[in-house]
């Protein structure tokens, strides 16, 4: 299996804090994969999450793409951003369909590692807690393993292209999300979040290698 993406792609490993790694990337003129390293525990809120109260003791930043909160911990998630310019053959005007191809890449990568995965091709299914917690809902192009969400995808578009932000879970604690966001009733939120998502039974390195190999 090749160690990098196809020649049509540029692989970059930016450095910085989680907040810095969420900064605008500027005009998108080519296909790029950004592999981001998480150095400190950080709760990342979606662009529409305003006035959210978060428990003390953790860094909090806001991303420019939508969806609910994502908890990033070192070693707990494989965070990959994918940049696609407008007009590329991978570009899809229909936002509801625009992430399907990316979900299929993740599913193919997981298949290489012996994990059966399903790409959600239906509409957004936020459930009760999806507006607050990314992994409590299911959106188009996101990936489920044994009925639980394991890869989340959000996107931000501008005139130049799309930035897809992917988080593949290597660890998951619904209890911690309930505590950080103060969700109530606690028992109901705990049960929902613990069953809604689950970590992948793979290591970050092989998963990244397989993901890069399956990029079109």
Give the label of every model feature segment.
Residues 69-75, 159:
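Short glycine/proline-enriched loop/turn "hinge" motifs that connect secondary-structure elements
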Residues 54-55, 90-95, 176-178, 206:
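Short, conserved charged micro-motifs
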Residues 79-134, 139-140:
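Internal, conserved structured core segments that host functional sites
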Residues 133-155:
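Aromatic/basic-lined ligand-recognition segments
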Residues 103-129, 156-216:
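Long, positively charged amphipathic alpha-helical accessory segments at protein N-termini or as interdomain linkers
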Residues 68-69, 154:
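Gly/Ser/Thr-rich beta-alpha loop segments that engage phosphate groups in nucleotides
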Residues 1-56, 61-63, 69, 83, ...:
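Active-site loop/lid in soluble adenylation, ligation, and acyl-transfer enzymes
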